[in-house]
């Protein structure tokens, strides 16, 4: 016994151990290389704990691949829906919208990829190194996006990789009465996907020469007892993306034509699939018989509407020993949508202690799958616009040029976008502007200029322009797509600045989490805004003054008002302006403008004449007040201002310049204030 132990443990130097050799003792011990050969180690069976760890790693990798398959399936499904909704022939009519092309119709361009004729609304001009412009239809543009987002451009040349099947775990179980078949009791950590079965050609390549199809009944219950190796999802994605995303099956509960392409519609489809119950486990027959290639009735899925209709997806045979025979209904969606071809083949069955299939994953796992899909959060689109501040006329011009790649909001994979502008702080209907709505497009071209009047240099220093892109819905609420914001103090006067910015989700305006001096400045700025809040809510008025020597009197022009306060319940006002030259000159001292219905930015362009000597004008003051007209009750006061010698600031300067420069019209913007006033009647 002692000799056996001594022979088994030898010193690394292959020499006998000497007790007085300290250097050899410091070198340590090692296992004799002849004690356990590689062949003996390979024949040893793995323990149940090791198999559990391996199965968990495989299941976790499969879960990530399944989520990736679903994400790519949604992208390709949206592309196929766009292909099904074509309305023209691509020759005389636009392939997308069906609009007439030619001399009597719209101008047409030829798609670079599909060589079909499209109108300029449905075509997108792409940048290229070629001297002539390159146009793509929206279908081909979407197909290129699918290639980029699915990784097909990368996996096209990616080498094949194989993940092993989970290993059966042997547990000591009580003996069952004779005649009762052994049931599958041990669940796997994660459900398996039948779409991972390899194609028939791959199986024949991996099968040794001379081996016939059928289960291997002589294999020992260990490493060789599990099923054949399967293909990775990346390999299948590569093969399908190389065929221009064709042959994908639309087995999302019957058809995808009625399913919305919005994220909410996708999540509803996922939850419906996850709610389906899993079929009960089927007892394993003994001994197992070879599986026939013919699929059972009702297992063949309908081929997708791609350009290769002959490519169909078959469900795996319903043999109890087949690894993917019992699977949740949710996997029916994952397999075909991922574009796999599960060709019928024979496989070595599991042993009688093979693990059973788990029920569908819980809602938390479904939410994880949705959160893993990051495309919906990053494809809001880009907006191209330009800004110009005309300092002389106190005018801010915002030209909305175009948007590209907007997020699809309608069931047809398109949107009805429009752009609206707000000035912050104090966003309201009074400072909201919007463009027209363009129908059924994700790449709208507006080329529309929106103007803000009465924007002073002070406004440019403390205001922010919010530009939002929304989708118009005739039968419901308009949906928000994305927005961007620009601080006007960064804009130089009389210099146009162009922007091409990616849209973002709603940006919070609260200054949360600021500390120290930054927090102090934030509170100071908010306090300043609150102090002038009453002034801003009243609005502004553009007034022109000119003393005419020919007519011998003062000509007052009321041009427009902007950003007036809303006085009616509908969020608007019915404004008019009243003039009163003080001290009282009788009835000829009072004038009124016309009433503008339901607006907060009225444009009057009216002039009024006061017959007065130039020497007497210095003793007078002009009271200007803006009112909201109401029927059956007293009018509401919005705001006013007073020009004259007793005024201050810009009002005094305006009055003084009028007296100094005869026969010269001088225009100034004035802030409306909640001053003391008399009745408008």
Curated annotation (Swiss-Prot):
Pfam families: C2, FYVE_2
Entry comment describing in which tissues the protein is expressed: Specifically expressed in brain.
Bilayer topology annotation: Peripheral membrane protein
Pro residues composition bias: residue spans: 278-296
Residues binding Zn(2+) 1, per UniProt: 94, 97, 119, 122
PTM section of the record: Ubiquitinated. Deubiquitinated by CAND1 to prevent its degradation.
Residues noted as binding Zn(2+) 2 in the record, renumbered to the chain: 111, 114, 137, 140
Cellular component aspect of the GO annotation: dendritic spine; extrinsic component of membrane; neuron projection; postsynaptic membrane; protein-containing complex; secretory granule; synapse; synaptic vesicle membrane
Cofactor section: Ca(2+)
Modified residues annotated as Phosphoserine in this record: 271, 679-680
Binding site for Ca(2+) 1: 409-410, 471, 473, 479
UniProt-annotated binding residues for Ca(2+) 3: 526, 568, 574, 628-630
Keyword Cell membrane among UniProt keywords: yes
Phenotype upon loss of function: No visible phenotype. Mice are viable and fertile and do not display any physiological impairment. Additionally, synaptic properties seem unaffected.
Example of a GO MF term: small GTPase binding
UniProt xrefs under SMART domains: C2
Biased composition, class Basic and acidic residues, residue ranges: 199-208, 243-252
Residue ranges occupied by any C2 domain in the UniProt entry: 379-501, 537-670
Record localization: Cytoplasmic vesicle, Secretory vesicle, Synaptic vesicle membrane; Cell projection, Dendritic spine; Postsynaptic cell membrane; Membrane
Domain characteristics, as noted in the entry: Binds calcium via the C2 domains. The calcium-bound C2 domains mediate interactions with phospholipid bilayers.
Subunit structure: Interacts with RAB3B, RAB3C, RAB3D, RAB8A, RAB27A and RAB27B. Interacts with RAB3A; this interaction recruits RPH3A to synaptic vesicules. Interacts (via C2B domain) with SNAP25. Interacts with deubiquitinating enzyme CAND1; this interaction results in the deubiquitination of RPH3A. Interacts with GRIN2A and DLG4; this ternary complex regulates NMDA receptor composition at postsynaptic membranes. Interacts with SNCA.
Protein name in the entry: Rabphilin-3A
Organism of origin: Mus musculus (Mouse)
Lineage of source species: Eukaryota, Metazoa, Chordata, Craniata, Vertebrata
């Amino acid at each position: 016994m002692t000799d056996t132990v001594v022979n088994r443990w030898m010193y690394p130097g292959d020499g006998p151990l000497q007790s007085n050799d300290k250097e050899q003792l410091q070198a340590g011990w090692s296992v004799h290389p002849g004690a356990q050969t590689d062949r003996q180690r390979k024949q040893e069976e793995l323990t149940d704990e090791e198999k559990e760890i391996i199965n968990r790693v495989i299941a976790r990798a499969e879960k990530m691949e399944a989520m990736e398959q679903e994400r790519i399936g949604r992208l390709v499904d949206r592309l196929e829906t766009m292909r099904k909704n074509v309305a023209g022939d691509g020759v005389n009519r636009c392939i997308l919208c069906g609009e007439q092309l030619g001399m009597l119709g719209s101008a047409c361009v030829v798609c670079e990829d599909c060589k079909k004729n499209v109108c300029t609304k449905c075509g997108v001009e792409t940048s290229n190194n070629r001297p002539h412009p390159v146009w793509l239809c929206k279908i081909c543009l979407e197909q290129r996006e699918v290639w980029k987002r699915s990784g097909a451009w990368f996996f096209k040349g990616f080498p094949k990789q194989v993940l092993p099947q989970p290993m059966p775990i042997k547990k000591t179980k009580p003996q069952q009465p004779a005649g009762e078949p052994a049931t599958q009791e041990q669940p796997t950590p994660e459900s398996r996907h039948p779409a991972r079965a390899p194609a028939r050609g791959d199986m024949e390549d991996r099968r040794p020469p001379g081996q016939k199809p059928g289960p291997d009944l002589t294999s020992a219950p260990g490493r060789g007892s599990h099923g054949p190796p399967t293909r990775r999802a990346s390999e299948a994605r590569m093969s399908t993306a190389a065929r221009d995303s064709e042959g994908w099956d639309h087995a999302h509960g019957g058809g995808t034509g009625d399913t919305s392409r919005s994220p909410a519609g996708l999540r509803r489809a996922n939850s419906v699939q996850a709610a389906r119950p899993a079929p009960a486990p089927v007892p394993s027959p003994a001994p197992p018989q070879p599986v026939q290639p013919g699929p059972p009735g009702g297992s063949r899925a309908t081929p997708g509407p791609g350009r290769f209709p002959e490519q169909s997806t078959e469900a795996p045979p319903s043999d109890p020993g087949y690894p993917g025979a019992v699977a949740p209904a949710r996997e029916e969606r994952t397999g075909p949508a991922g574009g796999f071809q599960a060709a019928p083949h024979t496989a070595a069955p599991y042993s009688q202690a093979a693990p059973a299939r788990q029920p569908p994953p819980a809602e938390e796992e479904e939410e994880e799958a949705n959160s893993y899909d990051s495309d919906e959060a990053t494809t809001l689109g880009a907006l191209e616009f330009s800004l110009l501040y005309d300092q002389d006329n106190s005018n801010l011009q915002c030209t909305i040029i175009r948007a590209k790649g907007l997020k699809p909001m309608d069931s047809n994979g398109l949107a009805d976008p429009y752009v609206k502008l707000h000035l912050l702080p104090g966003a309201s209907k009074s400072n909201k502007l919007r463009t027209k709505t363009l129908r059924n497009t994700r790449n709208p071209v507006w080329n529309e200029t929106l103007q803000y009047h009465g924007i002073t240099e002070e406004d440019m220093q403390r205001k922010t322009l919010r530009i939002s892109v929304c989708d118009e819905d005739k039968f419901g609420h308009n949906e928000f797509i994305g927005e961007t914001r620009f601080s006007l103090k960064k804009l130089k006067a009389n210099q146009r600045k162009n922007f091409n910015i990616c849209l973002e989700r709603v940006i919070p305006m609260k200054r949360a989490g600021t500390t120290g001096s930054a927090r102090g400045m934030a509170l100071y700025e908010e306090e300043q805004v609150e102090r002038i809040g009453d002034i801003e809510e009243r609005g502004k008025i553009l007034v022109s003054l000119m003393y005419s020597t020919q007519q011998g009197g003062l000509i007052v022009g009321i041009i427009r008002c902007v950003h007036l306060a809303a006085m009616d319940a509908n969020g608007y006002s019915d404004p008019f302006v009243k003039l009163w030259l003080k001290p009282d000159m009788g009835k000829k001292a009072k004038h009124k403008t016309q009433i503008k219905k339901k607006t907060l930015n009225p444009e009057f362009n009216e002039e009024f004449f006061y017959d007065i000597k130039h020497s007497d004008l210095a003793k007078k003051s002009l009271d200007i007040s803006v009112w909201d007209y109401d029927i059956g009750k007293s009018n509401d006061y919005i705001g006013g201002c007073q020009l004259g010698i007793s005024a201050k600031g810009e009002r005094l300067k305006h009055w003084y310049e009028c007296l100094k420069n005869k026969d010269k019209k001088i225009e100034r913007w004035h802030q409306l204030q909640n001053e003391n006033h008399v009745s408008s009647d």
